[in-house]
Amino acid sequence: MPGLTLGDVVPDLELDTTHGKIRLHDFVGDAYAIIFSHPADFTPVCTTELSEMAGYAGEFDKRGVKLLGFSCDDVESHKDWIKDIEAYKPGRRVGFPIVADPDREAIRQLNMIDADEKDTAGGELPNRALHIVGPDKKVKLSFLFPACTGRNMAEVLRATDALLTAARHRVATPVNWKPGERVVIPPGVSDEEAKARFPAGFETAQLPSNKCYLRFTQVD
């Protein structure tokens, strides 16, 4: 499944991890899960990223969101590297599993291959891919970064909150949205349905087109 993208079901892979063997669908279960790759252990950007993800792990746990890392290094390498990650920012613990994928099969199927990066033996390396997977095992959101650019974990958390809010309330979130701010009502929802679904009411933006498509409301 090299073209894995939004709406696709992730393959039910059997994976070797720092927490033992898992099946991907069993790991996701009835929750949301963030599966994310890094190019290699014992590298600078990856160390800062994994440290930051460890720092945010408690926030994801509060939301019932699971974390699963991926790279092509073996389990023992991951375990040794985790000591460096935890020493880099003392107090942060890497409590989530990291997949060992030395044959590159998992990262190929999950669309995590970086075409421009190779290891010293010429082997494929992962890019900085991140998929948010829903309880239905479908990809809900993806980020894709090159090896030279670290991800913003605050944005990953914000995007996760937006997805959870949209799923819970059947709304959409506008630009730069943060939890607690107003959301928008999707165009397919009539005003009559909106009144029933949002008893606190909604506000329609007055625009030159006189089209009433930009409607804001507040949800918990």
Curated annotation (Swiss-Prot):
SUPFAM superfamilies in the cross-refs: Thioredoxin-like
Catalysed transformations (reactions): a hydroperoxide + [thioredoxin]-dithiol = an alcohol + [thioredoxin]-disulfide + H2O
Keywords: Antioxidant, Cytoplasm, Nucleus, Oxidoreductase, Peroxidase, Redox-active center
Residues spanned by motif Bipartite nuclear localization signal: 195-218
A single BP term in Gene Ontology: cell redox homeostasis
Other information: The active site is a conserved redox-active cysteine residue, the peroxidatic cysteine (C(P)), which makes the nucleophilic attack on the peroxide substrate. The peroxide oxidizes the C(P)-SH to cysteine sulfenic acid (C(P)-SOH), which then reacts with another cysteine residue, the resolving cysteine (C(R)), to form a disulfide bridge. The disulfide is subsequently reduced by an appropriate electron donor to complete the catalytic cycle. In this 1-Cys peroxiredoxin, no C(R) is present and C(P) instead forms a disulfide with a cysteine from another protein or with a small thiol molecule.
Protein's name in the database: 1-Cys peroxiredoxin B
Organism of origin: Oryza sativa subsp. indica
